[in-house]
Curated annotation (Swiss-Prot):
Xref: InterPro entries: RuBisCO, RuBisCo_large_chain_AS, RuBisCO_lsu_C, RuBisCO_lsu_C_sf, RuBisCO_lsu_fd_N, RuBisCO_lsu_N_sf, RuBisCO_lsuI
Matches recorded under HAMAP family: RuBisCO_L_type1
Positions carrying N-acetylproline: P3
Name under which the protein is recorded: Ribulose bisphosphate carboxylase large chain
Organism: Galium elongatum
EC number: 4.1.1.39
Modification N6-carboxylysine, positions: K201
């Protein structure tokens, strides 16, 4: 019997509650390349030392519980426990601090975002010793990254499939998102694609309701795609939302989309869940479908500044679970600081290697090695007059997703799509000629209007 599992008669076991920091606060610990690292914003209850609360977070999200247990002697806590290895104050916040926690890799199932989140955030957020807790960032080690397939195809493969290069892609969400019949819905899809958009989109809550069952919608949208492709000579797509009440039904809808020969399907990855999303991503890679991801429900998790998770964590998790596009919001009209933070997680979606940069909200250097990139989707209240700023800020590897900015055109859907395409091509051309989009954007759009139908 090994020393760590041996028990001896007459040797007493000292039960009872002890301070977490005695076991889980280890400021001398040197992190390993294989550790998953987490940065938590901690708001403790009054009178509790930061070291104790940081250690409590490490304990309750790994091997710890509220009391000493005799079965601790049957394993190696030094191998499996989480460690709070550093604490730093939050500038301007007297009652908050950042606790850095290192988790040994063996705590996590390979290739499972579900298990990773269940461990790190599954229980500790209800800990009554904390007033609030927010997961600001994660460092995913290369050894764990390599256990994930990630996006079904990635940015370069998508461009090759679409044969579209050198500019952002254009999309539009069909409005009204609920209430249209399948045939009228398909008509709107055709008009937008025929007008010059690359994609149209189901909204997040378009699934299979009584007014429009999913199979009917898929058929009429496929007809619109093929008709617009024949008339424009361009490859088109519509994000067919495969999200369903069961994983089996979701895959059935994706199979039907593949049989129709359309290029892309869609999933609501937070409401659908990471297990369902990873399953769909694997199916899409195996069957040549692109996968568009909507982040419905994200604000429930990431909107509060002191509690929940920052969206950069959800974005990293999506890249691991799998998706070729994900909505990232838009920074048009926002404060400069928010712009930097948004572009920080946009780079985490697209780039292979991202350096630590606290000014952009990036707490850890992240190496994605061979995991494909994800196209950020800039959406939320944008229109053609935002096009210069969007082109400059997001660059070519992005999707500019309109809604009312296309459908709301006074002349109708097709002219709205034409306006989007003309504005984009004018901005890309001006940028390539060396013009300043920030200073000359309005004039560039006005010049383009003269030649727009």
């Amino acid at each position: 019997m090994s020393p760590q599992t041996e028990t001896k008669a007459g040797v007493g076991f000292k039960a009872g509650v002890k301070e977490y920091k005695l076991t889980y606060y280890t400021p001398e610990y040197e992190t390993k390349d294989t550790d998953i690292l987490a940065a938590f914003r901690v708001t403790p209850q009054p009178g509790v030392p930061p070291e104790e609360r940081g250690a409590a977070v490490a304990a309750e999200s790994s091997t710890g519980t509220w009391t000493t247990v005799w079965t601790d002697g049957l394993t190696s806590l030094d191998r499996y426990k989480g460690r709070c290895y550093h604490i730093e104050p939050v500038p301007g916040e007297e009652d908050q601090f950042i606790a850095y926690v290192a988790y040994p890799l063996d705590l996590f199932e390979e290739g499972s975002v579900t298990n990773m989140f269940t461990s790190i955030v599954g229980n500790v957020f209800g800990f009554k010793a904390l007033r609030a807790l927010r997961l600001e960032d994660l460092r995913i080690p290369v050894a764990y990254v390599k256990t994930f397939q990630g996006p079904p195809h990635g940015i370069q493969v998508e461009r090759d499939k679409l044969n579209k290069y050198g500019r952002p892609l254009l999309g539009c969400t069909i409005k009204p998102k609920l209430g249209l019949s399948a045939k009228n819905y398909g008509r709107a899809v055709y008009e937008c694609l025929r007008g010059g958009l690359d994609f149209t989109k189901d909204d997040e809550n378009v699934n299979s309701q009584p007014f429009m069952r999913w199979r009917d919608r898929f058929l009429f949208c496929a007809e619109a795609i093929y008709k617009s492709q024949a008339e424009t000579g361009e490859i088109k797509g519509h994000y067919l939302n495969a999200t369903a009440g069961t994983c089996e039904e979701m895959i059935k809808r994706a199979v039907f989309a593949r049989e129709l020969g359309v290029p892309i399907v869609m999933h609501d990855y937070l409401t659908g869940g990471f297990t369902a999303n990873t399953s769909l991503a694997h199916y899409c890679r195996d069957n040549g479908l692109l996968l568009h991801i909507h982040r419905a429900m994200h604000a429930v998790i990431d909107r509060q500044k002191n509690h929940g998770m920052h969206f950069r964590v959800l974005a990293k998790a999506l890249r691991m679970s799998g998706g070729d596009h994900i909505h990232s919001g838009t920074v048009v009209g926002k404060l400069e600081g928010e712009r930097d933070i948004t572009l920080g997680f946009v780079d985490l979606l697209r780039d292979d290697y991202i350096e630590k940069d606290r000014s952009r909200g990036i707490y850890f250097t992240q190496d994605w090695v061979s995991l494909p990139g994800v196209l950020p989707v800039a959406s939320r209240g944008i229109h053609v007059w935002h096009m210069p700023a969007l082109t400059e800020i997001f660059g070519d590897d992005s999707v500019l997703q309109f809604g009312g900015g296309t459908i709301g055109h006074p002349w109708g859907n097709a002219p709205g799509a034409v306006a989007n395409r003309v504005a984009l091509e004018a901005c890309v051309k001006a940028r390539n000629e060396g013009r300043d989009l920030a200073a000359e954007g309005g004039e560039i759009i006005r010049e383009a209007c003269k030649w727009s139908p």
